[in-house]
């Protein structure tokens, strides 16, 4: 869903990854939370900001 926000215990470390959904995630943990809980079809497009 558009308004879904995946949450799990992630550090605040800034190690950005760019998702295939065009969103910059602050680190791989936050990306995986979104993927697991909201959109299993997203992938990491590349490391770094989108």
Curated annotation (Swiss-Prot):
Glycans are attached at residues 30, 41. It comes from the Eukaryota. Residues 2-50 form the Kazal-like domain. Disulfide bonds join 10-29, 18-50. The record marks 11-12 as: Reactive bond. The keyword Disulfide bond applies. PROSITE patterns: KAZAL_2. InterPro entries: Kazal_dom, Kazal_dom_sf. SUPFAM superfamilies: Kazal-type serine protease inhibitors (SSF100895). CDD domains: KAZAL_FS (cd00104). SMART domains: KAZAL (SM00280). Keywords: Disulfide bond, Glycoprotein, Protease inhibitor, Serine protease inhibitor. One of its GO terms (molecular function) is serine-type endopeptidase inhibitor activity. The keyword Cell membrane does not apply. Serine protease inhibitor. Strongly inhibits human neutrophil elastase and trypsin, also inhibits porcine pancreatic elastase and subtilisin A. Does not inhibit chymotrypsin, plasma kallikrein, pancreatic kallikrein, thrombin or papain. This is Protease inhibitor 2. It comes from Cenchritis muricatus (Beaded periwinkle).
């Amino acid at each position: 869903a558009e308004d879904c926000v995946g949450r799990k215990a992630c550090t605040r470390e800034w190690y950005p990854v760019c998702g295939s959904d065009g969103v910059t995630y602050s680190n791989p943990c936050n990306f995986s939370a979104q993927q697991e809980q909201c959109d299993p079809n997203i992938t990491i497009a590349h490391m770094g900001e989108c």
